[in-house]
Amino acid sequence: MKVKETNSKPKLASRGTFQRKGIKIVGKWKQVTIDPNLFADGQMDDLVCFEELTDYRLVKNPSRLFSSEETKKRKAQAVSEEEEEEEGQSSSPKKKIKLKKQRDAARAAEGAAAQNEYEVKASEPEAQGEVTACSDQKVGGAKSESLAQAAPRKKKNKGKKKLDTFQSTSPKLPKKSKKTWMAEVHDQKADVSAWRDLFVPKAVLRALSFLGFSAPTPIQALTLAPAIRDKLDILGAAETGSGKTLAFAIPMIHSVLQWHKMKAPPIPRSTGMPPREMRFGATAHLGSPCKDRTESGVLPEEARIETEAQPSDSGVQATPETSASASAQTLLVCDDDAGEGPSSLEEKPVPKQNEDGEEKFDAEQAGKLKQELCDQIAIYKVHPRRPLLGLVLTPTRELAIQVRQHIDAVAKFTGINTAILVGGMSTQKQQRMLNRHPEIVIATPGRLWELVKEKHPHLSNLRQLRCLVIDEADRMVEKGHFAELSQLLEMLNDSQYNPSRQTLVFSATLTLVHQAPARILHKKHVKKMDKTDKLDLLMQKVGMRGKPKVIDLTRNEGTVETLTETKIHCETDEKDLYLYYFLMQYPGRSLVFANSISCIKRLSGLLKVLDVMPLTLHACMHQKQRLRNLEQFARLQDCVLLATDVAARGLDIPKVQHVIHYQVPRTSEIYIHRSGRTARAASEGLSLMLIGPEDVINFKKIYKTLQKDEDIPLFPVQSKYMDVVKERIRLARQIEKAEYRNFQACLHNSWIEQAAAALEIELEEEMYKGGKADQQEERRRQKQMKMLKQELRHLLSQPLFQENLKTRYPTQSGRPPQPVLASRNIESALSCLSRQKRRRKKPKEPRAPPQPGSSTS
């Protein structure tokens, strides 16, 4: 039996071209009888005969498939010729001959090893559903034919051979890492003994050691034991950056591993296969590498083996040779887009080769191999396809992507497959991901409900769902938001209800209760809601039945202890001044929040004119651009990200130093989540609020809800630099307004002209936005813009923070002293604020009372 190799991941054909394929003939051509009456008209006189072929295979890269033996023979002949030439050349140096012989011997050894290697690699099928199959060249003594013939022999080029050897010795380029805004982690080999009492699976412990998580956080320590051991529903509330993702990811992974362990089929003893080939449910919890993909108790769908019985065209009885060749026609088929699976035919007896290089099997070896294949097929067919076992729902797309990356990192050595379903991305690609039958799906409610309504097979039966997670649940169940979530929860609790399903609900503001608006409190029969009422309402909306375990680790203030809060009172027009001053005085990774997209766009244009070059993130952006901006913001050390509340919840961006509230949030929950983007994982951070006259009401509500004991300190601002900042902001506003007005006018006028051309009508000047300007007016406007930009460019070229030296005496050169740049990088915003606090806390020294009898003149 001889099995050919094909590429595991063939390149897709380019658009507009056809991929070359060949036909592997397995059976024989049959003559088709034709009715003689069809030849009466004389239109088919040129037809000689008509034959059909029913037993064949479509193969890719046929020249490589059928000419491998010839290439091996040519290589062997070339090696022997080179050896003869080397023996005949006695005048060459001995050292060169020795090195060349060693190199040729190594090549010959590699060629022999490649011939003796007996390994099956399943190639990835095309989207059209064609199967790449490998079979023997001889079937029933008939030699197979192909449309693609072997390439003709060519003379060897020594220069090309040298180039090939150089390419083989050159180091390979490193693989591109996955795009993510999270910090890259290498193998930390941390001590995970603190996790052992929390019933964490061994495979997860290995991943935690790899990630460097030596000890659990408080929310993890209190959640894992009741969730894994007692299988209780959890309502968890903890501060931002406290590790809530792992608190629900580890119980979900444990639940999936337990399902695989229960569903694993028993190991048959009659197979005679090596123990290494039959690693099943007994090693599901040992945490072997994920490349074997067998720790979860069953081999993956990618390694599923299917056989097809080949029909015999002739009536000749099967000989041992034909039976061996028939067994060689067993197909190893992969699921669509599933990649390579583990080879199930490793360490088998190598078939003997005759002088012509053709492989022959004994009848005994063929029988053993066929029996082993049949046993494996029986095992795989006993196990059903993997259902959906874990579902995670998140409010934003970026948070869903981040949760998926966290789960993949923890499930690194478990072999569990995950998929993500979010809007803004290709629906067809996500459907193909679901076709792989992942055990865990992370999704936003909109796209998930869309695929559920389309009745995707993997989402059609949710009764086997073992774990449901709702992250940021207080936002998800708010009235007027996520209408698809209510329909999804209703389906899960009614027609797709599973009584053994575990529900985990987490949020940083799960138990925070803010005061309702006055218009609602003035109504009749309105009861003030407390923490218990809020949790009961949440349990009712989610559909929790029974009494869950409530874990509340939040403080009354809502924010973490390592967060420093400060504020600046200013007019609305002065917010741009203080924002630009802060960004220039204290550089670093700063995240600026606003309440509206229009404000984000205006700030972006203003800061770009001032050469700050910020990044933006809001709901009207394309999803790929949103992810690209997040990755760039996490990569750069000195960068500004302007974002709406899309980026307020859950995002774990490393080393964010400052969070600036350009507009005060409307609720205290949003303020807590915004401020939680910094000061994560016991690190320090700064939260700055720019409070205008219209923000005072919202600020007082937040201050009252969070029960602040002391007033939020004012941020120190050096007023001596504000005059230069005001001049820069004035020029930048004029330029930004003029450019925005010109852009809107051009956009409107171009649309009007296109519509008029389509309707074949003439336009009047009043229909143009701002009137149809003549050339003289346009030149005057451009000249004015050029002057403003030159003036601003001159101001930007001057240092903003400088100290003017004052002296009472003339200098030696007779010129005024040069200004000295202020050392703005020495002191950070946190150190400046702490220094101001220390000054305020210093007690004033009491003045000594005047002594009696002393007089003042």
Curated annotation (Swiss-Prot):
GO terms for cellular component: cytoplasm; nucleus. Residues 309-330, 825-834 have a biased composition (Polar residues). Residues 61-179, 279-363, 808-857 are annotated as: Disordered. Residues 848-857 have a biased composition (Pro residues). Its main location: cytoplasm. A motif (DEAD box) lies at residues 471-474. Ubiquitinated by MDM2 without targeting DDX24 for proteasomal degradation. Instead, polyubiquitylated DDX24 promotes interaction with NIP7, a component of pre-rRNP processing complex, and associates with pre-rRNA molecules and pre-ribosomal particles. Residues 576-723 form the Helicase C-terminal domain. It holds the Pfam family DEAD. Residues 152-161, 835-844 have a biased composition (Basic residues). There is a cross-link at residues 370, 624 (Glycyl lysine isopeptide (Lys-Gly) (interchain with G-Cter in SUMO2)). ATP binds at residues 238-245. The modification Phosphoserine is found at residues 80, 92, 170, 288, 296. Residues 225-528 form the Helicase ATP-binding domain. CDD domains: DEADc_DDX24, SF2_C_DEAD. ATP-dependent RNA helicase that plays a role in various aspects of RNA metabolism including pre-mRNA splicing and is thereby involved in different biological processes such as cell cycle regulation or innate immunity. Plays an inhibitory role in TP53 transcriptional activity and subsequently in TP53 controlled cell growth arrest and senescence by inhibiting its EP300 mediated acetylation. Negatively regulates cytosolic RNA-mediated innate immune signaling at least in part by affecting RIPK1/IRF7 interactions. PANTHER family: RNA HELICASE. Belongs to the DEAD box helicase family. DDX24/MAK5 subfamily. This is ATP-dependent RNA helicase DDX24. It comes from Mus musculus.
